[in-house]
Amino acid sequence: IVDKSLQGVSLRDVAVTVWDAEGTPSASSQAQTSENTPAKQASAPTKAIVTHQMDMIFTHFGFSGPAILRCSGHVNQWLFAHPEADSCLLTVNFQPKLTQAELSAQAEAGRDKQLLTLLKQWVPERLALVLCQQLGVAPETAFKQLTHAQVSRLWSLMTAFPLSATGSQPLEKGFVTGGGVSTKEVNPKTMESKLTQGLFFCGEFLDINGYTGGYNITAAFVTGTIAGQYAAWKSFELQG
């Protein structure tokens, strides 16, 4: 994957899960200097933090798209809480609407087909070739020739393909920032600080980072309006 064989491949309606676990990129993928690095192997998942079923795309720097953007904040929070970790583990289910049993049934129905041909009914050809590579099986191999272990590994890759996220894009390319003044320290009715009287916060000053889709700008407008109104009223009160 480090040779960018998946660059530009887009996936529709996949399920991306962020795990409470460190990703472990292969030696070759560690050499890639992107913010998000596809990995061959990852540590065993322990607890799922969040799952988003949307579109995603492999890019020149790693991976992106609606599902990844929604997961990115959780990845950054996990990495911040685990400074000793080099990356955070994500997995992708390429066919979330199908169970492994259903995938197996479809495969058995076409067991005489070449593995590449079979995989192309579920994923784009370039991704299918990567899956064959991960299995160590030639693309033209008939599905019926796979061993039980290879079939089991295939379904694991199809439903939990591991990716290691080492971080997000730099601030100038971000959609929203995280961090700031804790909302627990602000009166939500007035946006006034609970610690310093007469000090009001709004927008990016607050530790609010919602999903893309207008939520962040709405939060900025609403908190800005409230903070502005109550700051003005507070000023009038102080003037007597």
Language model: regions and residue ranges:
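Short, basic, low-complexity termini and linkers enriched in Ser/Thr/Gly/Pro
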Residues: 27, 238-240
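Short hydrophobic core segments
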Residues: 56-61, 199-201, 224
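Short, flexible micro-motifs
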Residues: 65-68, 76, 182-183, 206, ...
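Domain-scale detector for complete catalytic domains at protein termini or as standalone homologs
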Residues: 89, 115-121, 166, 184-185, ...
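A glycine-rich dinucleotide-binding beta-alpha-beta segment and adjacent secondary-structure elements
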Residues: 129-209
